[in-house]
């Protein structure tokens, strides 16, 4: 399992970091078998596996449930679990209680929290021993206000993102996720931070990349963002399900090959 210091060492050696967002035991098991460096249990699970319209409906209980499953599937991978909306920003005492509960009950290596406003939370969480990954740029929990669009696209916005990135690092963040920002801006931020910067829709100049398991494998998704590359096609599973339906209806399944050979009814009838 990678450690924070090893991830920083990868950045210093210019070895790119791979990260995949996964939500359950079997996907986490596959991600670990593939040798991926990090797993993010993202609150995007709300739309991807729970069928919600957005991340707004995702609860702390949801994140703990899925975080535990991922840890069981990937016991030797660096796992980061999202703080869902409402888990940060109520009061510092509540925020830290939520963070501690998530961190302890999922056995995660770090938690992730969105936005530039959380620097005081990062400082306090770090002080009590909870590693925090920051998330800037497009932050899904704020799409109701910001919308799904490129962030940092003006001079002022870019300068603010650079400042925000420096602030979360200074507050103690162990890594930073940058989402949907211009690639040259992401590269500039990556160069000026000592912590690893993981990009999603932020070009190749970051220290690593993260994509969602379901997006990159075309597993049950209808719409994919511009920055998503499909590396395999799990949608072919629908063909298998159709064949199963046909064989059940025709009586072709189960054949003798899939049936136990043991016969018992003669013995049952002889007892009468």
UniProtKB/Swiss-Prot annotation:
Annotated GO CC locations: cytoplasm
UniProt catalytic activity: 3-methyl-2-oxobutanoate + (6R)-5,10-methylene-5,6,7,8-tetrahydrofolate + H2O = 2-dehydropantoate + (6S)-5,6,7,8-tetrahydrofolate
Chief subcellular location: cytoplasm
Required co-factors: Mg(2+)
Record's cofactor remark: Binds 1 Mg(2+) ion per subunit.
Residues where Mg(2+) binds: 43, 82, 114
Record: active site: 179 (proton acceptor)
Keyword Transcription in annotation: no
Cell compartment(s), UniProt: Cytoplasm
CDD domains registered for this protein in UniProt: KPHMT-like (cd06557)
Amino acids binding 3-methyl-2-oxobutanoate: 43-44, 82, 112
Annotated GO MF terms: 3-methyl-2-oxobutanoate hydroxymethyltransferase activity; magnesium ion binding
Gene Ontology biological-process entries: pantothenate biosynthetic process
UniProt keyword annotation of Mitochondrion present: no
EC number: 2.1.2.11
Keywords tagged on the record: Cytoplasm, Magnesium, Metal-binding, Pantothenate biosynthesis, Transferase
Gene3D superfamilies in the record: Phosphoenolpyruvate-binding domains
Assembly and binders: Homodecamer; pentamer of dimers.
Family label: Belongs to the PanB family.
Purpose of the protein: Catalyzes the reversible reaction in which hydroxymethyl group from 5,10-methylenetetrahydrofolate is transferred onto alpha-ketoisovalerate to form ketopantoate.
Protein name, entry field: 3-methyl-2-oxobutanoate hydroxymethyltransferase
Species: Staphylococcus aureus (strain bovine RF122 / ET3-1)
Gene field: panB
């Amino acid at each position: 399992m990678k450690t924070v210091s090893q991830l920083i060492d990868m950045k210093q050696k210019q070895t790119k970091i791979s990260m995949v967002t996964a939500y359950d035991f079997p996907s986490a098991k596959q991600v670990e078998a593939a040798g991926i460096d990090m797993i993010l249990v993202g609150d995007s699970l709300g739309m991807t596996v729970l069928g919600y319209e957005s991340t707004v409906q995702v609860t702390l209980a949801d994140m703990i449930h899925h975080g535990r499953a991922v840890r069981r599937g990937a016991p030797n991978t660096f796992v980061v679990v999202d703080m869902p909306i409402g888990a940060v920003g109520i009061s510092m005492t509540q925020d830290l209680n939520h963070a501690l509960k998530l961190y302890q009950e999922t056995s995660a290596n770090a938690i992730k929290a969105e936005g530039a406003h959380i620097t005081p939370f990062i400082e306090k969480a770090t002080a009590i021993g909870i590693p925090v990954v920051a998330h800037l740029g497009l932050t899904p929990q704020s799409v109701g206000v910001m919308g799904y669009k490129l962030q940092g696209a003006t001079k002022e916005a870019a300068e603010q993102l650079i400042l925000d990135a420096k602030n979360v690092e200074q507050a103690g963040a162990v890594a930073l996720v940058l989402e949907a920002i211009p690639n040259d801006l992401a590269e500039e931020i990556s160069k000026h931070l000592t912590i690893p910067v993981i990009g999603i829709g932020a070009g190749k100049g970051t220290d690593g990349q993260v994509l969602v398991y379901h997006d990159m494998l075309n597993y049950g998704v209808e719409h994919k963002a511009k920055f998503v590359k499909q590396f395999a096609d799990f949608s072919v599973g629908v063909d298998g399900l159709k064949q199963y339906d046909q064989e059940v209806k025709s009586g072709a399944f189960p054949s003798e090959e899939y049936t136990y050979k043991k016969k018992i009814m003669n013995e049952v009838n002889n007892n009468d």
